[in-house]
């Protein structure tokens, strides 16, 4: 988790609270003063001061490594996060074997009720250029889901005494890619085969 607030009081409660050891201090980002409920002040002046810190903490190198984007922007980051959230919540909108409504969503997503911090992994994240000449099997995509490089939380460290588990849900609706976006569709060769 990354905690960001222009006003430090709320995040300082996490820094000094009971659960402070759960969060890395570098993931608690605060400014020196708040925007005083003024959008323009937060967007154009005070907020711009911590943008670099936030982008560094959100592992912007993810876009550099996987999508061949030299300098990822907010748009690139928002598209990636939007794609992940859309895919995770697809079973709320379409037919699927699990996560039929919001109450079942948490029940099925959290393997142990006391350990309720879900970790999202998304694979494959490849650019449109790579998709034309890379052939990925189901086994490779499945293995990529368990690689730490594809996890959306970079600072998590599991302890030995904590039980770990995962759940898989099947959704019959494939994810939709933003037209002109950074991520590639994987059905290009299928489309070529049936274009004749």
Curated annotation (Swiss-Prot):
Task: State the GO CC annotations.
Answer: cytoplasm; microtubule
Q: One of this protein's GO BP terms?
A: microtubule-based process
Q: Which residues bind GTP?
A: 7, 78
Going by the entry's taxonomy, the superkingdom of the source organism is recorded as Eukaryota
The record's section on Gene3D superfamilies has: Tubulin/FtsZ, C-terminal domain (3.30.1330.20), Tubulin/FtsZ, GTPase domain (3.40.50.1440)
Query: What is the E.C. number?
Result: 3.6.5.-
One short Pfam family name for this protein? Tubulin_C
Q: How is it modified after translation?
A: Some glutamate residues at the C-terminus are polyglycylated, resulting in polyglycine chains on the gamma-carboxyl group. Glycylation is mainly limited to tubulin incorporated into axonemes (cilia and flagella) whereas glutamylation is prevalent in neuronal cells, centrioles, axonemes, and the mitotic spindle. Both modifications can coexist on the same protein on adjacent residues, and lowering polyglycylation levels increases polyglutamylation, and reciprocally. Cilia and flagella glycylation is required for their stability and maintenance. Flagella glycylation controls sperm motility.
Sites of 3'-nitrotyrosine modification: 19
* Record's subcellular location: Cytoplasm, Cytoskeleton
Q: Where is the active site?
A: 104
Binding of Mg(2+) occurs at 7
Q: Which PANTHER family match?
A: TUBULIN
Self-association and partners: Dimer of alpha and beta chains. A typical microtubule is a hollow water-filled tube with an outer diameter of 25 nm and an inner diameter of 15 nM. Alpha-beta heterodimers associate head-to-tail to form protofilaments running lengthwise along the microtubule wall with the beta-tubulin subunit facing the microtubule plus end conferring a structural polarity. Microtubules usually have 13 protofilaments but different protofilament numbers can be found in some organisms and specialized cells.
Question: What does the protein in this record do?
Answer: Tubulin is the major constituent of microtubules, a cylinder consisting of laterally associated linear protofilaments composed of alpha- and beta-tubulin heterodimers. Microtubules grow by the addition of GTP-tubulin dimers to the microtubule end, where a stabilizing cap forms. Below the cap, tubulin dimers are in GDP-bound state, owing to GTPase activity of alpha-tubulin.
Give the protein family: Belongs to the tubulin family.
What this protein is called in its record is Tubulin alpha-3 chain
């Amino acid at each position: 988790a990354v905690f960001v607030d222009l006003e430090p009081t709320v995040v300082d409660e996490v820094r000094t609270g009971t659960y402070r050891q759960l969060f890395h201090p570098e993931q608690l980002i605060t400014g020196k003063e708040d925007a005083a409920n003024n959008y323009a002040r937060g967007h154009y002046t005070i907020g711009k001061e911590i943008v670099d810190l936030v982008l560094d903490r959100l592992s912007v190198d993810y876009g550099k490594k996987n999508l061949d984007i030299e300098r990822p922007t907010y748009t690139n980051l928002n598209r990636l996060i939007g794609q992940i959230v859309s895919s995770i919540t697809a079973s709320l909108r379409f037919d699927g074997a699990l996560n039929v409504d919001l109450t079942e969503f948490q029940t099925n997503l959290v393997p142990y009720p006391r350990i309720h911090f879900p970790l999202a992994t998304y694979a494959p994240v490849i650019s449109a250029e790579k998709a034309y000449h890379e052939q990925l099997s189901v086994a490779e995509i499945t293995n990529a889901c368990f690689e730490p490089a594809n996890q959306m939380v970079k600072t998590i460290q599991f302890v030995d005494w904590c039980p770990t588990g995962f759940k898989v849900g099947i959704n019959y609706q494939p994810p939709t890619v933003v037209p002109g976006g950074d991520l590639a569709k994987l059905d290009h060769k299928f489309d070529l085969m049936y274009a004749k």
